[in-house]
Amino acid sequence: MRDRSLESFREVIKKILDAYRLQLGVDEDVKIKIRRYRTRAAFSNIKTKTIYINKELLDLGEETLKYLILHELIHIKLNTKYHNGDFHSILSRFISPEEITFIRRNIRERLLKIKS
């Protein structure tokens, strides 16, 4: 995915978002914004239903994008910024704990490179 244009990434992100919105039953219109952040992988504004993804992480692969979008979409679905039992239960239905650990490690490594 490293050679993709930003527009190509947006298409992939839209497909992932639409698929997870359907599977999670999120009826609200959810926007995604891609920007550079030094310390954040992704975050969401629950009130505006907007997910922000770090542009520096786009080339880590589609599985990472799926994780980031799913993670933030669960926050929007549950209307909470916290990682409670419901949050983890939903997340684990889609991505195994081992895969989550692997993805998070890759994200941390990339963010550390950005900071230095």
Predicted segment positions?
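Walker B catalytic acidic pair
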Residues: 72
